[in-house]
Swiss-Prot record:
Pathway: Cofactor biosynthesis; coenzyme A biosynthesis. It catalyses: 3'-dephospho-CoA + GTP = GDP + CoA + H(+). Its EC number is 2.7.1.237. Catalyzes the GTP-dependent phosphorylation of the 3'-hydroxyl group of dephosphocoenzyme A to form coenzyme A (CoA). This is GTP-dependent dephospho-CoA kinase. It is an enzyme of class 2 (transferase). Signal peptide: none annotated.
């Protein structure tokens, strides 16, 4: 399914001025896969949703028998194209430019996360910054996972404090035409 409303304003949040701030992990950085997988498994057992942003972290979980509630991927890992083996019941397609977040993606992620089925969001462009709208839309206690290049996996446990931090980052972003 393609999610697109051509009547919407073509605006984005741009983060060029925040590259350094966004390059640090904003959650728990796991460098040990066993500890990471144990933590994720326990979160699922407690009834929380697992949401991944990035192809590599999604694939690591899948290869270890953990299927995220929602995966946000662009089909590339460090700009190379890996093979996908897991197919979900619900697939969505969005467009998002590198270093930006389209305004419409906030509403799209909120609607997808309200759905009981989750799925996979294929991003035409780049998914890295979509951690922001996903974190704002996830429920308290859900975990959002993204890769920290050459370091490990970052796990954000969603709560009001982390949402406040995300909103603070958004306030510093520059609004531009996409």
């Amino acid at each position: 399914m393609e999610i697109r409303d051509n009547n919407k304003v073509n605006l984005c949040f741009a983060f060029d001025n925040l590259r350094k701030e966004l390059s640090r992990p904003y959650g728990i950085l796991f460098t040990n896969n066993k500890l990471f997988l144990d933590f994720v498994s326990k979160s699922i057992q407690q009834g929380f949703k697992v949401i991944t942003v990035g192809d590599y972290v999604s694939r690591v979980l899948e290869e270890n028998g953990i299927i995220p509630f929602l995966e946000v991927i662009d089909g590339k890992t460090k700009r190379s194209i890996p093979q996908r083996t897991i197919v979900k019941n619900k697939e969505y397609r969005v467009t998002n430019e590198a270093g930006k977040i389209r305004f419409e993606i906030f509403e799209i992620m909120e609607n997808i996360l309200k759905d009981r089925d989750g799925g996979v969001v294929f991003v035409n462009g780049e998914e890295d910054l979509l951690v922001i709208p996903v974190t704002l839309s996830a429920d308290n206690g859900d975990i959002v996972i993204y890769g920290q290049p050459n370091a490990g996996a970052v796990v954000i446990i969603v709560n009001e404090m982390i949402r406040w931090r995300v909103r603070d980052i958004l306030e510093k972003a520059v609004v531009k035409e996409c």
